[in-house]
Design a protein with these regions (language model features):
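Function-dense linear segments that define catalytic or interfacial modules
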Residues: 47, 51-54
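Gly-rich Lys/Arg/Thr-decorated short loops/hinges at beta-loop-alpha junctions or inter-strand turns
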Residues: 56-70
Length: 400
């Protein structure tokens, strides 16, 4: 058998006379080598991350902030260089690229007087394509505008930029598997994106991996209370509805928005206690609770709110006639807790999913609403320039 293919890492050469068995053996060897190299890559990444962490730890014997910073300096420089590239491209090249304009059917393009990149993370940049398109008389959709620029000019410019960057630092242009060592892949298009802080955002996705979405059809949330498992599912849904409301209104009418929030509060105050109580796992109950009986509660300094709430529940259960119906709360158990209006304690808990209605303390719906819904909401709206809503503003008008 004459081998007709060329493999960069194979010991077999094109035109070499080999048997089928030799080819299968070589394939097996290359698969083992690929697996080994993949493991080495992962180990190296973990090692570098560990080195960065330990060298930046002030109690480490070889602590050195400058060396720690140098570990991540290259990746930091790459993202800064990428931001600079996109800003220059859209401010200098795109407005004056007549050939590109002709291909895209653009006859008018005003100067781009803002930075094209409005957010960058460790390995990604977000570009203001909608604002850029509005500077032109492009006739197509936003998605078509993005793809037209990429296919007709930008993709090649990005590739050349990365090749030049690697050459400047004398790096490898290809990885061991033959792929480019550095590439910038197009990920998604969004109708709009809302950031509250770094790595905390809401994306209203328009296109991703070849699939188009209508507004609000695919909303991705990262780092916010909507995604936290400790936030009750019912409350997460209320927050999700409000986020959709915000994404639908580019300019919020404060009066209408307050009416919407009041409606959400009405739903909240009509919910059962298990739907608005916070879920947490109890750790260190026996360590922090010294006394919890006969209305006397004594704790070790540093006790958490969920342990305090659990101790009140245990005390009430102990003196009730329902000791055989409900469990005592112990370390390791998952519980739900909430703020209470009862003068005996401002917090109360129960075993997760098993509310003890016979001796539940009354819930402080107003405080619970403020903590679970209003506080997370204010973090979102203040990030878009809307003043935080005080609790008093959401209070219902008296009926008499």
């Amino acid at each position: 058998m004459i081998l007709e293919i060329e493999l960069n890492h194979s010991s077999l050469k094109k035109g070499q006379n080999v048997t089928e068995e030799e080819i299968l053996m070589e394939i097996s060897r290359l698969e083992r080598e690929a697996s080994y190299q993949s493991t080495i890559n992962k180990v190296s990444k973990v090692a570098l991350n560990s080195i960065y962490g330990v060298l930046g730890y002030h109690s480490f014997i070889l602590y050195d902030r400058e060396i720690a910073r140098s570990v991540s300096e290259q990746s930091s420089h790459v993202i800064r260089y990428t931001i600079l590239f996109f800003n220059r491209y859209f401010q200098q090249r795109f407005p004056n690229h007549r050939e590109l304009h002709a291909k895209m059917g653009i006859t008018k393009c005003d100067p781009i007087d803002f930075n094209a990149v409005n957010y960058a993370d460790t390995d990604s940049v977000f570009i203001r394509y909608k604002d850029i398109m509005d500077k032109t008389d492009y006739k197509g959709t936003l998605e078509e505008f993005v793809f037209d620029i990429g296919e007709n000019d930008l993709n090649d410019c990005v590739k050349d930029m990365l090749v030049g960057y690697i050459r400047k630092f004398n790096g490898f242009q290809q990885k061991i598997d033959g792929q480019r060592s550095m590439k910038l892949a197009f990920e998604m298009i969004c109708h709009n994106v809302l950031w509250t802080s770094k790595k905390k955002y809401i994306k209203n996705i328009s296109w991703e991996e070849g699939v188009y979405f209508k507004p609000l059809e695919n909303v991705e949330v990262k780092g916010l209370d909507i995604n936290k498992s400790s936030t009750p599912k019912f409350v997460r849904e209320l927050l999700r509805e409000t986020v959709h409301y915000i994404l639908q209104h580019r300019e919020l009418n404060l009066r209408d928005f307050i009416d919407h929030v009041k409606m959400q509060k009405s739903k909240f105050e009509s919910a059962n206690v298990e739907d608005v109580a916070i879920s947490q796992r109890v750790n260190g109950y026996e360590k922090y609770v010294i006394t919890a009986k006969d209305g006397v509660f004594e704790y070790v300094k540093g006790v958490t709110i969920q342990i305090r709430a659990s101790s009140v529940y245990n005390a009430e259960l102990t003196k009730s006639k329902y000791k055989h119906k409900y469990q005592q709360i112990r370390s390791g158990m998952k519980i739900q807790y909430y703020y209470s209006t009862d003068p005996r304690s401002d917090v109360f808990a129960f075993v997760n999913g098993d509310p003890c209605y016979e001796f539940l303390y009354p819930i402080d719906y107003s405080k619970q609403f403020e903590m679970l819904y209003l506080s997370p909401l204010n973090k979102i709206i203040t990030s878009i320039g809307v003043q935080a809503l005080p609790v008093s503003l959401i209070a219902f008008d008296p009926l008499w």
